[in-house]
């Protein structure tokens, strides 16, 4: 009965092997994350007498190569939520945290939870690619929001409220009409220096070039906004700044669109795709996000397990004669999954479907 605790970090891990009653089989030692070192570690653990179980914390992407190599070598591997390790056996007033201490702590956890450890199973390539793609999508969306806010701030000096002139939906390639417009008409004087008719003709050609619908009323609205704009004088520097910001925003927006399309393509290969997409409030954007965060739903033993994974189960708050009425959610699980669920519920609440069972039960 060999309990292997592995404290994983970037590029290396600390390994400790223990047996019941505090017997130390192998003192904590360091292993680099190279193919040869991980292979040697697997062989060393397989050579131990008795059954061997390996436990390591889920640490982003760092633990995945280690878990895969050890599992592929035929060892029992369990990947545990770091919260469980953090809350385990904190019976000392000293708060010592080193890689060696953590490895020993994980090994003791392995011994204590021996019969309840869940075996690690590598994700299939499609689910892994979907989750990685979603992570990059999140990063790109955050950068796009930052660049968009920066551009709007710069427009306050050259063409105030130009971003509010258009309400066209985003194209499939990520392009937005107001961003394309600002790329060519970066200053209010680019419009106001012309007559209304001259601008209308120029705007018509611009719409035809970029594939947008032209209306004379919209042309007159843009012209009136430009004439009444209070902006700084035109300068080559202002033009450079605006056009470079537009180019950056377009590039990131195209990346966001590409990630979204790839996520949809990958999610269509999963068996639960049709079921998820039939859910009200879930579309081609939120559906793949939901599937990416939940992963293989078959790994959950019950719906309560899935609720706990999302961190939305109620948190009891009772003590003695005091009964807590405000039992908020635990928020221990995936924050990204909770955000996705929040967006889905926002869609449901905004559209208010009359035949939704949620509203039928509430009304009853």
At which residue positions do the language-model features occur?
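A detector of single, family-specific signature residues
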Residues: 1-361
């Amino acid at each position: 009965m060999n309990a292997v605790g592995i404290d994983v970090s970037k590029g290396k891990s600390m390994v400790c092997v223990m047996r019941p009653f505090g017997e130390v089989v192998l003192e904590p030692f360091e292993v680099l994350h190279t193919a040869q070192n991980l292979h040697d570690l697997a062989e060393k653990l397989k050579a131990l007498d008795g059954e061997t179980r390996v436990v390591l914390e889920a640490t982003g992407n760092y633990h995945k190569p280690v878990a895969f190599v050890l599992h592929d070598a035929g060892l029992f591997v369990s990947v545990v939520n770091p919260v469980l390790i953090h809350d385990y056996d904190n019976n000392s007033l000293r708060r010592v945290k080193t890689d060696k201490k953590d490895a020993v702590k994980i090994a003791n956890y392995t011994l204590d939870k021996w019969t309840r450890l869940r075996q690690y199973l590598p994700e299939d390539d499609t689910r892994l690619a979907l989750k990685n793609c979603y992570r990059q999508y999140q990063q790109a969306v955050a950068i796009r929001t930052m660049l968009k806010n920066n551009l709007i701030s710069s427009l306050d000096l050259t063409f105030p409220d130009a971003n509010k002139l258009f309400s066209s939906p985003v194209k499939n390639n990520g392009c937005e009409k107001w961003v394309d417009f600002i790329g060519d008409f970066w200053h209010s004087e680019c419009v106001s220096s012309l007559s209304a008719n001259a601008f209308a003709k120029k705007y018509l050609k611009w719409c035809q070039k970029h594939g947008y619908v032209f209306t004379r009323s919209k042309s007159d609205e843009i012209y009136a906004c430009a004439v009444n704009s209070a902006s700084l004088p035109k300068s080559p520097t202002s033009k450079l700044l605006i056009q470079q910001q537009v180019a950056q925003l377009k590039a990131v927006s195209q990346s966001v669109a590409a990630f979204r399309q790839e996520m949809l393509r990958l999610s269509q290969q999963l068996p639960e795709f049709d079921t998820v997409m039939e859910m009200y409030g879930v579309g081609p954007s939120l559906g793949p996000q939901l599937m990416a965060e939940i992963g293989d739903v078959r790994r959950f033993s019950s719906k309560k397990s899935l609720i706990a994974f999302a961190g939305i189960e109620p948190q009891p708050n009772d003590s003695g004669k005091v009964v807590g009425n405000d039992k908020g959610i635990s928020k221990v699980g995936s924050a990204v999954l909770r955000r996705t669920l929040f967006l889905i519920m926002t869609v449901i609440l905004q559209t208010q479907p009359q035949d939704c069972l949620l509203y039928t039960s509430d009304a009853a």
